[in-house]
């Protein structure tokens, strides 16, 4: 059963099952040429909100070493329902809204439902290695399907051109899979994990 926290902005209800801190493990397996990289890792994922109509997201992964955990990778970003920004939303930058905040009731949020019975979502992620991703997709019940709409790379970043991600709430755990197109390779399986709610 998924509990909806008191004070959660109505726009976040379709994503509310993600809220909290999750911890578990996963595996990365990716072939480049004749070499295949395979690593198991531990992972901690956090989804939170600060009263605004988006989720704050962070993921930190580590590899178990002989002397304890060794930092591996991290990413951070924001998840929200995909809709046109209105005068009731802040921005750009630090500009305040000039109208009432939109989509504050369940009835108003239901108008954002798509033809498939889900809600369109967008996810903006930043990686410290010089890659930023914008994903678009859909949340339907306790499943999220995402595909990159845009990838930005700094001059020094490794080659990375696109990705898809899948998230699902299964047996009270968060399962995910991440396919990537990188290092001159087409889109293919890259990593997956299973994390449990710890907070």
UniProtKB/Swiss-Prot annotation:
Listed Pfam families: THAP4_heme-bd
Which species? Clavibacter sepedonicus (Clavibacter michiganensis subsp. sepedonicus)
The catalytic activity of this protein is classed by the Enzyme Commission as 5.99.-.-
- Per the UniProt entry, the disulfide pairs are none
Motif GXWXGXG covers: 20-26
Q: Which GO terms describe its molecular function?
A: heme binding; metal ion binding; peroxynitrite isomerase activity
Q: How is the cofactor bound?
A: Binds 1 heme b group per subunit, that coordinates a highly solvent-exposed Fe(III) atom.
Q: Which reaction does it catalyse?
A: peroxynitrite = nitrate
Q: What SUPFAM superfamilies does the record tag this protein with?
A: Lipocalins
What family does this chain come from, according to its entry? Belongs to the nitrobindin family.
**The keyword ATP-binding is annotated on this UniProt entry:** no
Q: In which pathway does it act?
A: Nitrogen metabolism
Residue positions binding heme b: 158, 190
Q: Any idea what this protein is called?
A: Peroxynitrite isomerase
Q: What cofactor(s) does the depicted protein rely on?
A: heme b
């Amino acid at each position: 059963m998924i509990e909806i926290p008191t004070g959660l902005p109505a726009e976040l209800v379709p994503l509310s099952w993600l809220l909290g801190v999750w911890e578990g493990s996963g595996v990365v397996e990716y072939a480049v040429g004749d070499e295949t990289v395979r690593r198991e890792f531990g992972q901690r994922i956090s989804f939170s909100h600060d009263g605004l109509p988006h989720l704050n997201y962070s993921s930190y992964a580590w590899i178990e070493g002989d002397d304890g955990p060794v930092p591996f990778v991290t990413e951070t970003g924001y998840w929200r329902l995909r809709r046109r920004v209105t005068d009731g939303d802040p921005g750009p930058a630090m500009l305040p809204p000039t109208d009432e905040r939109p989509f504050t009731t369940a009835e108003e949020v239901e108008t954002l439902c798509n033809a498939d019975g889900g809600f369109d979502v967008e996810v903006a992620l930043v990686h410290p290695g010089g890659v930023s991703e914008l994903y678009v997709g859909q949340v339907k019940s306790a499943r999220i399907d995402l595909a990159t709409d845009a990838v930005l790379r700094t001059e020094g970043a490794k080659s990375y051109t696109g990705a898809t991600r899948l998230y699902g709430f299964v047996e009270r755990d968060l399962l995910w899979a991440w396919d990537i197109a990188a290092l001159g390779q087409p889109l293919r399986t890259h990593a997956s994990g299973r994390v449990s709610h710890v907070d």
